Design a protein with these regions (language model features):
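Conserved N-terminal structural module of periplasmic/extracytoplasmic solute-binding proteins
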Residues: 7, 21-130, 316, 375, ...
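Hinge/lid segment of periplasmic solute-binding proteins
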Residues: 126-178, 192, 201, 207, ...
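Extracytoplasmic/periplasmic substrate-binding proteins
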Residues: 66-70, 83, 88, 264-355
Length: 457
């Protein structure tokens, strides 16, 4: 009983430890109407039923879906909404009520739901900082892994959603950390894509001299900076990356020279002016807007934002010229250019307390049918699925999509989970709240490493 109580408390505190992929603070309704002052959206269908026994007998079934994708008109939110609409059309006794909040609001509400009872289907992340404590607290329902043998999941993609040999969720994406850049801006100014990290820092000065922001960075949320640090560490430490992080998190000792080196390099990067003024307090949407309106030459984020190439809210001259490159090689580092920071991040799970659990699992399984999330995601250019998408490639994809696929295909190794998601929720909270201070010089490198180490004890 004592362990159970402690686990529940941990689950409540882990709300601040979730990795984010959503960028919009604005919610769209299913009809596409803007609702800027609202933080949630509800989708219903007047014709309701389900696919379980009660539904097939005509009994109405209502599913509640809690999502971190508030933009229902573009990207992953559009894909999610499309599948919901199709499910309700095919199962006219089922109503799916969607609550879709932006990242920070989602974290806060998840904490409340941990106390009050979770909605039936929820967005989750397959990383220890999130999954371990939630599963220990009994929040998520176990899934039957054998059910997904024919779903085309990429080898190893279910590992992060597995705990003590049991499956508790399904991954949506294969995520790659990339620099998006404005190809036309680069060409017009004679700038070259950097091949080394020193090249990148030198380019920052050149771009700044032109009156343009080199890289738009979401430094306010913490996790993108932690991913950036992980990206640097992988390029520097190479195959030792996972062991270095594991040793540090398990002992609380972050004095490894590799960690010291890349943290110093992060500070040097900020000092060189690679990021915009005020990056350490600006959020996802602000950083993305700097790039999509042409104020910044680059934007550091995950491959889930490849839908920018088809987003008509972005000026055509910009969206048709968005390209990507991965972290350049670091001087003295062990990794080569094709060793990239990539992992399986966000996905979905079913609440252990759901009163319509059978229907919730059936809806989850419907979402992951190979011709649903994977196919629609590819068609809408929302990055790479955790499932095989080769059957859906037509040759008509955007140049940005093709480039991301080529990067993954040419990769020689993948980093795995970013450092901020490799420990407890306390560690995640610590590193994501302290990383701004070390990058801007408020905190020394030694103090930063000591502070995050203390959070592991």
């Amino acid at each position: 009983m004592k362990r159970k109580i402690v686990s529940v408390i941990l689950a409540l505190t882990m709300v601040f430890s979730m990795v984010g992929c959503g960028n919009s603070s604005e919610t769209k309704t299913s009809s596409g109407t803007d609702t800027e002052t609202s933080s949630e959206t509800e989708t219903t269908n007047d014709e309701t039923s389900g696919t379980d026994e009660s539904a097939s007998s005509g009994e109405e079934v209502t599913l509640r879906l809690f999502s971190n994708l508030p933009d229902r008109k573009n990207g992953q939110g559009l894909v999610e909404q499309t599948i919901i609409d199709e499910y309700m059309a095919e199962n006219p006794n089922v109503t799916i009520e969607v609550e879709a909040l932006d990242e920070e609001a989602y974290k806060t509400k998840f904490k409340a739901y941990s106390m009050e009872g979770m909605p039936d289907v929820v967005s989750i992340w397959g990383q220890p900082a999130f999954l371990d404590e939630v599963v220990d607290a009994g929040v998520l329902a176990e899934l039957n892994q054998d059910d997904y043998s024919e779903y085309g999941f990429v080898e190893g993609s279910l590992n992060g959603f597995t705990y003590d040999g049991k499956l508790y969720g399904l991954p949506r994406n294969t995520d790659i950390a990339v620099f998006y850049y404005n190809q036309k801006m680069f060409t017009d100014n004679g700038w070259e894509v950097p091949q080394t990290y020193n090249d990148l820092l030198a380019l920052a000065g050149t771009i700044k001299d032109a009156g343009i922001i080199p890289v738009a960075m979401d430094g306010g949320d913490g996790w993108p900076m932690a991913v950036y640090l992980s990206d640097l560490l992988y390029k520097y430490a190479g195959s030792d990356y996972s062991q270095i992080i594991s040793n540090a998190v398990s002992t609380g000792d972050f004095s490894a020279p590799e960690l010291q080196k890349v943290t110093e390099l992060l500070k040097e990067t900020a000092d060189a002016g690679l990021f915009q003024n005020g990056y350490d307090s600006q959020d996802y949407g602000t950083a993305m807007n700097l790039f999509t309106n042409g104020q910044a030459a680059m934007f550091y984020m995950g491959s889930w934002e490849t839908s920018m190439a088809t987003n008509e809210d972005i000026p055509e001259e910009i969206r048709t010229n968005i390209r990507v490159f991965t972290m350049p090689v670091v001087e003295g580092g062990k990794a080569q250019a094709t060793d990239i920071a990539a992992w399986n991040g966000g996905g979905y799970a079913v609440s252990a307390s759901s009163e319509v659990k059978e229907e919730a699992v059936k809806f989850l399984n419907y979402m992951y049918q190979p011709d649903k999330l994977s196919k629609y995601g590819w068609e809408n250019g929302v990055g790479l699925s955790a499932q095989d998408q080769s059957a859906y490639m037509t040759g008509e994809e955007t140049d940005l999509q093709k480039q991301v696929v080529d990067i993954l295909s040419a990769s020689t190794s993948l980093s795995g989970t970013p450092i901020n998601d490799c420990g407890s929720s306390a560690f995640k909270t610590s590193i994501e709240s302290e990383i701004q201070n070390v990058s801007n010089g408020t905190t020394s490198v030694d103090d930063f490493l000591s502070t995050i180490g203390a959070s592991c004890n």
